[in-house]
């Protein structure tokens, strides 16, 4: 069975209750299904908190965090350090043998600078599956932060949805983007069950899909097109539904190629 990539985001990393529910669901799923799993994560809330403590400005452009040279080391520490090791500690609590990685390990993705105006913000593309396949075949759970490294050796902050998309392409994996919301919502706050590129363009033009959700939807559409299969956007808040979601049942918004 092809691997499943689960991207974690939102305030999940700040909530012990949410992490407990998530890892309990992961344990249940792994016991019932011999399917390779990969976790990909960002940690925007952790970064925002750290920036506030350090009195550094937080600037976002089109839903992406502007990352100047004097912040990339701090953001790397927050994502590849604190956020990644927090998830590893939860895996250990639940007897899951996990390995902490970033996008640069084993050349799993190829990362280039996205836009000079954004600073040290990268775009990830599919790379070599060798390292991840080796870990998965040995029964490990890779936990991958969204920090990338360019061919020139520069650290890059990559949007975690886009990072997960690139890794899904690397592995030919199914992809689930977990977030704070139950899926993509229409103008009345109701969940949209299915989303096409045409429908997404309409909702963006109408100002219903905005900011970070635009990045998330575009990443999901890119992944659905590249993989030739749907991608799910769903909430981590309903833990009892997560095993069904991991097993292919749509509980959020299903993005169609």
Swiss-Prot record:
Q: Which GO terms describe its biological process?
A: arginine biosynthetic process via ornithine; L-arginine biosynthetic process
Instruction: Give its E.C. classification number.
Output: 2.7.2.8
- Is Kinase a UniProt keyword of this protein? yes
The protein's matches in Gene3D superfamilies, at most eight in alphabetical order, are given as:
Acetylglutamate kinase-like
GO molecular function terms noted in the UniProt entry: acetylglutamate kinase activity; ATP binding
Reported function: Catalyzes the ATP-dependent phosphorylation of N-acetyl-L-glutamate.
| Subunit structure as annotated in this protein's UniProt entry | Homodimer.
**The protein's name:** Acetylglutamate kinase
Q: Which organism is it from?
A: Pectobacterium carotovorum subsp. carotovorum (strain PC1)
Q: What is the lineage of its organism?
A: Bacteria, Pseudomonadati, Pseudomonadota, Gammaproteobacteria, Enterobacterales
